[in-house]
A protein has these predicted regions:
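Acidic, His- and aromatic-enriched active-site or binding-groove loops in soluble protein domains
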Residues: 87-104, 137, 158-179, 183-195
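Short, solvent-exposed loop/turn segments at secondary-structure junctions
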Residues: 10-13, 74-78, 107-110, 147-150, ...
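Active-site and substrate-binding clefts of carbohydrate-active enzymes
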Residues: 2-46, 181-191, 210-211, 225-430
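Long, low-complexity, intrinsically disordered segments
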Residues: 440-484
């Protein structure tokens, strides 16, 4: 039986503001708050909210038959928490239907997987904890930034304990093979690989409303037939796309949501089921390893890193950013960590691309890739200065790590002592209350009987007063005072 693996990504980058050379050292805030609020609010209203409501309706209508998967970047979660919490509430409502699986990905939606394995592990752990706190589930399958995958990345992900990973069904890696099978990492067979079908995925996300497309207009019945016509021995078709394809890339007026809501019925008529990534990793056997020497992605015709690292400016910017990666990770300063996450986001490098077809010409506030490069490098100059001021270059990473570990251990000891003091205070307070309660509960003691009055004693006779002695007048002397 053939299964559909339907996956949506939610990512929003943090927009940077105009930052000039003379701002370095004086202004440590790098973000365009107005544009961040405007873009996330617009995307939520026109795409995320109506799309999630449609998916909830599908889950309630089709029950356990319908299933899908989601991943969210950390930057997207932070923006949604601040400006559009309704999206997270709808995701939680969808989660309660039992039809959705949440995947892990790097917190920043950056390139730590190819630049710093330790930073990559740290980011994935932080994002997994965030997903657990929001939805109460622990991700078991990983999706990398931009669907990036290579053998080395796969081995790293397997080492972290994930059972599966999503990847692009790129021609340069598949060759004659089909993306409709389950493969495994060439360096570690424990990691199963689910490969995106680029053609069928982009029929929905990119071509659905293209009036010049020879298949326009696309109906759910036609699309379900295309999937059913795939060879019967091919067990899975992976449809991966950004959630904003529903409402932004393909406007709501194109009836994209009506197409989506009609699709499960048509697929069921063709004997096709839905399955989550974890279910497929458990149910299907790998047909063999998939060697991927160089990283692949789901962007542009080349399906490689060229949209982000295709020119010398992008490479220099990424190298400069990761020159302080270990110090930021080891140091753990919250403000630096937050800036680090935002500056890593892949969109910052894509604005610097000189490829004609990259991003469709959209560059945000920048007039050219060189303008984007200058602005980004100015911000990096200030950011790196702050890192070096807090963690001087004279201290190497091992020494810094040892120093911060000592400080942390001392802080932990103080915290333990504070907790012990609080426990003793609580114990003393409880004992005092118990003693007071016992005193109040005890019956009042009866007063002691008075001793009988002693009989009155006969007063003793008064002693008679002795007669006063006769007064002897003082003899006065004569003329000489009695002197001889």
């Amino acid at each position: 039986m053939k299964s559909i693996c339907l996956y949506f990504e939610i990512h929003q980058n943090i927009h940077l503001k105009r930052y000039r050379f003379f701002d370095i050292g004086t202004d440590h805030y790098y973000y365009d708050d107005y544009e961040n609020e405007r873009s996330i609010t617009e995307t939520a209203e026109n795409s995320y909210i109506p799309a999630l409501r449609a998916l909830i309706e599908m889950a309630e209508r089709y029950g356990s038959y319908f299933k899908c998967a989601f991943s969210l970047s950390g930057t997207a979660i932070e923006l949604l928490e601040q400006y559009s919490p309704e999206v997270l509430e709808l995701l939680d409502q969808l989660n309660r239907t039992g039809c959705v699986e949440f995947l892990a990905e790097p917190y920043s939606h950056g390139f730590s997987s190819i630049k710093s394995p330790e930073c990559f592990k740290d980011e994935v752990r932080r994002l997994s904890r965030k997903i657990k706190s929001l939805f109460g589930v622990e991700p078991r399958v990983l999706r990398n930034s931009c669907l990036m995958y290579s053998d080395e990345i796969g081995a790293l992900v397997a080492e972290m304990g994930f059972k599966g990973m999503l990847a692009e069904g790129a021609k340069q890696t598949l060759g004659w093979k089909s993306p409709h099978y389950l493969y495994h990492c060439a360096l570690d067979p424990r990691l199963k690989l689910l490969l995106r079908d680029p053609g069928l995925s982009e029929d929905i996300s990119y071509r659905f409303n293209d009036r010049s497309w020879n298949e326009y207009p696309l109906y759910a019945e036609t699309y379900a037939r295309w999937i059913a016509e795939q060879p019967a021995e091919q067990p899975v078709v992976c449809l991966f796309m950004e959630l904003c394809a529903l409402g932004m890339f393909q406007p709501l007026e194109s009836n994209i949501l009506e197409f989506l809501k009609a699709l499960p019925e048509q697929l069921r008529d063709q004997g096709i089921t839905f399955a989550t990534p974890s279910e497929l990793c458990e149910q299907l056997e790998s047909v063999g390893p998939l060697p991927v020497e160089y990283p692949t992605t789901w962007v542009d015709e080349e399906r490689d890193l060229s949209p982000w690292l295709g020119n010398i400016m992008q490479q220099e910017a990424l190298d400069k950013l990761y020159s302080v990666a270990d110090r930021v990770r080891i140091g753990g300063d919250k403000r630096l960590r937050q800036d680090w996450d935002y500056l890593q986001a892949s969109n910052n490098l894509r604005f610097i691309s000189t490829k004609a077809n990259s991003y469709g010409g959209y560059r945000g506030i920048y007039s050219s890739p060189y303008d984007a490069f200058t602005n980004y490098m100015n911000i990096l100059g200030d950011f790196i200065t702050r890192v070096n001021e807090l963690y001087p270059l004279e201290i190497d990473n091992d020494e810094l790590n040892a120093l911060l570990t000592t400080i942390k251990n001392q802080g932990d000891e103080l915290e333990v002592k504070d907790k012990e003091i609080d426990k003793l205070k609580n114990l003393i307070g409880r004992l005092e209350k118990e003693a007071q309660a016992r005193e109040e509960a005890a019956p009042a003691e009866a007063p002691a009987p008075e001793a009988p009055a002693a009989p009155a004693e006969t007063p003793a006779p008064k002693a008679e007063k002795a007669p006063a002695a006769a007064h002897t007048p003082k003899k006065k002397g004569g003329k000489h005072g009695g002197k001889r």
